[in-house]
Amino acid sequence: MSGSGDRRGGGPPGSHSGWETMGKKSKKPGQAGGRQWAPWSSTNVTPNTARPAWGGSGSSHPSGTSWAQAPDHGAATRGNPRPPSQTSRPVLAPPLANGWQWQSRPRPSGSEVKKDDAPPSGSVPEVENVDGNNTSDDDDDDDDDLSDDISDDYDSDASEKSFETRKTNKWFKEFFEVLNTLSLEQINEQTRQWHCPACKNGPGAIDWYKGLQPLVSHARTKGSTRVKLHRELAALLEEELSRRGTSVLPAGEQFGKWKGLQESTDREIVWPPMVIVMNTFLEKDEDDKWKGMGNQELLDYFGEYEASKARHAYGPSGHRGMSVLIFESSAVGYMEAERLHKHFVNQGTDRNSWHLRKVRFVPGGKRQLYGFLANKEDMEAFNKHCHGKSRLKYEMRSYNEMVVIQMKQMSEDNQQLNYLKNKMVKTEQRSKAVEESLGVVTQKLRETIEENIFVRSKAKEKHMEYEEEMKSQEEIFHGLIEDIHKATEDKEKQFEKLLQEERSKARRFDVDSGTMKDRQLRKEYVQKFIDCQVKDVAEFEVERDELIKVHEDKKLKLKKEYMDLELELEKEFDAALTGLMEKHKPDTFEASSS
């Protein structure tokens, strides 16, 4: 950017009268030839404004500090149209009182953000892009600024430049100078707030990032303006933190830093579980040797705790006053031993009491027993004068393995047992319900079968009655038909007899008396009568046959219709019976699954 008026030297702007102008030749006609920062006006800030640096908490806020509001005629933002008269020149907020000290600026409250966003009085506010016509031009300028800035400080091949040289870029120099003054603890503070140096004098310059992780994420993902500059910032930050022996914390680790429990709570315990009982002396015998409790006597004293065995320690002087209660080799046995141990603790007769302020006798002359869970040193002391098979055998085992895991397994088994018990109860309830339902259904089935037998017998009786009635009606019907047939036969016989009589009369007629003519006439008349009768008989036979045929056809047709009607009647009966059976069909029995 030779020939431009940009600020050099890398230092932050001081408290002098104003910023130096940085300009760049425009690559596009019609655009402004450079960018300017508005002069610093001391009248815009309340005189006694204090801007203390945060100590990582971000809680310090300016008191009574605000930017003066811009004049109404300059408010081209929030949807107002762009002034058509001149090319808009973005004017940024005045510099900080102490220079570009990002970490030293207090984060404004919600009400102060709105005030700080406004430009100072007397300056022209930056006009938003309403119609979207100049966005690409601004982006091109930003990319050009980045290219020029990098090429001004060092050669274009960034991969060959040293890390320290890249940090002296004018965009990052002040940021890394501040970063170098902080310790690792201060850098990793999640409450420390930062501005993005790559967004300086542009959109997002006033945004705060709580911790370096959000800042690095912003630099990695920035995709609209100054993309190369943001990527360079992300790479430099990661390299800087790596060289200083730290890294950017993941987002999930930014909050909630607490010290938890120890990694392991396991310990070694004596197995099988044992409780040492001290002061079990009784008295000395004639040989000046101590006598003490017996095994059963010791078990009886602590019968509430279900110890399985008892042993006593003996030495050259007899009973050593040290006894042990051995419990079952299980998690339950350990819990019993621990319960006895806690009983001694609550009573004030535990290990500490025995070692620090042992009181062997209580008022009345009785010996006070002390007890505690056995450890390895106790067992070695117990076996001090024991050799070979007389030594009390034990081993040191993992508490988690022998107690915790077994208790968890017992809990799971108990839950499984409860589940199986509940399941068994439900199964028994279901079985009982099914049995009751089966009894009810069986009773109903039995009653239904009896009802069906009764209905069938009644139906059979009715059927027999109907058959007898139909048979009787059929006999009457056949009798009437037989009577008709008999009457018809009688009529036919009478008719034939009449024909024969008339023919006989004609044949017996005297045709020989009288004249020849008369005889001839009488013969012709008789012959004609006989011929006519024969002819009539022949016609009668023909017509009778036709009548019989017609009658038989009618009978056949009537029988067919009757059979069809009977068949239809049987079908109707079958359909009605099927519907009745469907109506009274018993429900399907299914065992309840609930």
From Swiss-Prot:
InterPro entries: SGS3, XS_domain, XS_domain_sf, Znf-XS_domain. Expressed in a dome of cells at the tip of the meristem that extends into the adaxial side of the initiating primordium. During the later stages of leaf development, expression becomes restricted to the margin and vasculature. Changing C196Y: In lbl1-rgd1; complete abaxalization of the leaf. The keyword Nucleotide-binding does not apply. Residues 1-163 are annotated as: Disordered. Residues 136-157 have a biased composition (Acidic residues). Residues 408-509, 545-577 form a coiled coil. It holds the Pfam family zf-XS. Keywords: Coiled coil, Developmental protein, RNA-mediated gene silencing. The keyword Lipid metabolism does not apply. Residues 39-49 have a biased composition (Polar residues). GO terms for biological process: defense response to virus; regulatory ncRNA-mediated gene silencing. Belongs to the SGS3 family. Required for the biogenesis of miRNAs and trans-acting siRNAs and essential for the specification of adaxial/abaxial organ polarity. May be involved in natural virus resistance. This is Protein SUPPRESSOR OF GENE SILENCING 3 homolog. It comes from Zea mays. The lineage of its organism: Eukaryota, Viridiplantae, Streptophyta, Embryophyta, Tracheophyta. The gene is SGS3.
